[in-house]
């Protein structure tokens, strides 16, 4: 009886096994037949794509609004999982740091991220959100240093659970931006070792941090961001757009005799690390912007007489911006630019109304915002009369 019972159990097991096996085989065949055709290649028929939101939220902008406020604008409503702000250490900025517990040379990641995670130089912040969660406001417990380098590290999540982890550089806000204007421009040098330069004149004292020089001929990738340097009214700052040879030393402190390269001035020299020409040889639109306030403060448009239109779309766009901002008063077409006559390959321009602007600054009558300018405020100079830094 025991053998019979065991035999019955085994038969019952086999019956259940084959029943499940054939049901599985049937449904598997049905599914596979809708996906595979006779050539065994995958067919689009029978494949169903499930709908849903699988994209991480996007950061539209990160802006230092003031010394104690940073805003993060986003593409959609998010929940902040965590945010930290840290001062980027000069020691760590160009190296890699080990993870906690990691051996030397192993488990390393960028030092800026190491600092931003709050391990070092942490700046305490409190977080608010506006615009339905699409704007994050970081209120800092202490002010950032003018021109200081910081890293904002964070993790955010949208309503569908999609997350984004990011690390972004932040430059310390400058509430005391110096009031400066273009004063002399050389698009190229005919002397051996000479380079292009843009000279700035300081109308009101302050710090240069956040001031940006751009050439529409060159593009945004080559914007010149001025360093955090204190300047006084009446100072000249010569920005050399190429470094060529020895002695190209930028003068960030009080010693203004460090720069000894060809074209160095007796005033403050700043050298841009670059070996290519920057300014347009036939036409260009130069803009000077205070990025701390998103304010255009000066502009200069020039073109060879032979040109009847802007040669690149970015030139026309920059010219339009200069005009619509109220800085370049005469218009934005090629006819409204400063005209360069003759066939000379070198263009040197000098501002003629510096004395009037200086007097207005001293008397407190200089208008707020950008300085209005027209082509007649400028003149062309010869190579023998170029005077960078004076």
How would you label these PLM feature ranges?
Residues 1-38:
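Sec-dependent bacterial lipoprotein signal peptides
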Residues 37, 143-147, 228, 235-390:
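Solvent-exposed beta-edge/loop recognition patches
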Residues 77-125, 211-213:
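Short, surface-exposed alpha-helix to beta-strand junction/turn motifs within ectodomains of secreted
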Residues 117-119, 215-225:
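Short beta-strand and strand-turn-strand segments in soluble, beta-rich domains
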Residues 128-132, 228-233:
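Short proline/glycine- and polar residue-rich coil/turn motifs
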């Amino acid at each position: 009886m025991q053998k019979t019972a065991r035999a019955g159990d085994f038969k019952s097991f086999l019956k259940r096994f084959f029943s499940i096996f054939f049901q599985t085989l049937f449904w598997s065949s049905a599914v596979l037949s809708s996906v595979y055709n006779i050539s065994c290649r995958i067919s689009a028929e029978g494949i169903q794509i499930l709908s849903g939101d699988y994209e991480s939220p996007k950061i539209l902008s990160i802006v230092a609004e003031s010394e104690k406020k940073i805003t993060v604008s986003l593409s959609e409503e998010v929940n902040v999982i965590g945010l930290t702000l840290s001062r980027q250490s000069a020691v760590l900025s160009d190296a890699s740091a080990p993870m906690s517990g990691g051996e030397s040379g192993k488990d390393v990641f960028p030092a800026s991220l190491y600092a931003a995670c709050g391990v070092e130089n942490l700046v305490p912040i409190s977080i608010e959100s506006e615009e339905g969660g699409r704007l994050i406001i970081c209120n800092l417990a202490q002010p950032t240093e003018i021109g200081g380098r910081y890293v904002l590290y964070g993790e955010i999540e949208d309503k569908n659970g999609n997350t984004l982890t990011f690390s972004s550089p932040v430059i310390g806000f400058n509430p005391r931006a110096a009031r400066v204007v273009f004063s002399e421009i050389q698009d190229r040098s005919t002397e051996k070792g000479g380079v292009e330069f843009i000279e700035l004149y300081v109308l009101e004292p302050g710090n240069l941090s956040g001031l940006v020089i751009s050439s529409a001929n060159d593009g945004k990738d080559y914007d010149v961001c001025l360093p955090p340097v204190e300047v006084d009214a009446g100072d000249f700052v010569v920005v050399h757009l190429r470094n060529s040879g020895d002695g190209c030393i930028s003068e960030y402190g009080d010693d203004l005799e460090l720069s000894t390269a060809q074209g160095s001035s007796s005033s403050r020299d700043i050298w841009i690390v670059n070996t290519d020409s920057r300014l347009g040889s036939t036409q260009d639109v130069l803009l000077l912007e205070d990025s701390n306030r998103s304010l255009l403060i000066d502009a200069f448009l020039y073109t060879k007489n032979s040109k009847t239109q802007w040669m690149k779309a970015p030139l026309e766009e920059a010219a339009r911006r200069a005009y619509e901002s109220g800085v370049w008063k005469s218009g934005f077409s090629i006819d409204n630019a400063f005209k360069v006559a003759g066939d000379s390959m070198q263009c040197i321009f000098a501002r003629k109304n510096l004395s009037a602007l200086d007097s207005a600054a001293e008397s407190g009558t200089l208008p707020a915002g950008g300085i209005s300018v027209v082509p007649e405020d400028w003149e062309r100079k010869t190579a023998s009369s170029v005077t960078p830094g004076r």
